Amino acid sequence: MSKLTPRANGTELRVMSSNILFEKCLVDRVPLIADYYRDCAADVIGMQEVNRVGTALFDILADGYTAVAKTHADGKHCFTPILYRHDRFALVEGGSELHRMRATDTKSFSYAVLEDKETGKKFAVLNTHSAIILACHKLEASNAVEGEQWRGDNVLQMLEKRDELYQKYGQDLPVLITGDFNAVPTGDSITTMKQHMHDSADVATLSNEKNVCSYHGRPGTPCRLEGCGPIDFIFVNDTVKVLTHNVPHDEAAIAISDHCPVYIDATLN
């Protein structure tokens, strides 16, 4: 049970998305991130921007969590691992793929199929850091045009993996997709995702936080609470009932990164 954020009544699963910002200051924030994860007590955490400094979290949190997709199949570093509570779940399968359309190899998605050790229920989590085009990439392309096209393909790539998992485990497999999508709620890529999955902020039955700008620029910088919306999302399919959708923006939450964590409390149908 979380010390800071008690679970909603009836919660079966708490899932978080967390971009930890891999700038040089990460080495100083690793202990803060570890403490925050312990306090939030999520069952599954989809992470982004986990460089080699950030992998220290795997050892620090090893008493409670196991990491999936620390590397890609070819042995190269994966920046989008998934953490899961090994006391509750067994890993059925997992892996990762670089996004087909990207500027750097930091943009990928990972996946994990987990089984509840007590109930035998299986569910899948996919986790992405979607494409963005920045000036430093020195590409003859814009983030608004080509970048959005890339992000649209990133979404399609994840939906292809989701469909593969449906074929293997059945159409009733609960699926959650976490991540930094680098797109606002009205972006084309998010619109595409919403045609196939539900934004947890839209379907939460008890409470939600829709308008908090989940990206806030620098660790410790207060968030804008309206007028921009999030770029970090958790999407679910019909077999996941979302109770609460949360974008914490208190001092502890904004200190760990330039992104607020996003988490949901949910049940699996």
Task: For the regions a language model picked out, list residue spans one by one.
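N-terminal, active-site-proximal structural segment of metallo-dependent hydrolase catalytic domains
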Residues: 1-61, 72, 76-78, 121, ...
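Metal-dependent phosphoester-hydrolase catalytic domains
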Residues: 1-5, 162-176, 182-269
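Acidic/histidine-rich helix-loop elements
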Residues: 12-31, 72, 100-103, 131-150
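Active-site metal-binding loops of divalent metal-dependent hydrolases
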Residues: 18-20, 130, 179-181, 260
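Structured beta-strand-rich core segments of catalytic domains in phosphoester-bond hydrolases
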Residues: 44-134, 246
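His/acidic metal-ligating clusters that form di-metal
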Residues: 112, 120-126, 144-178, 190-193
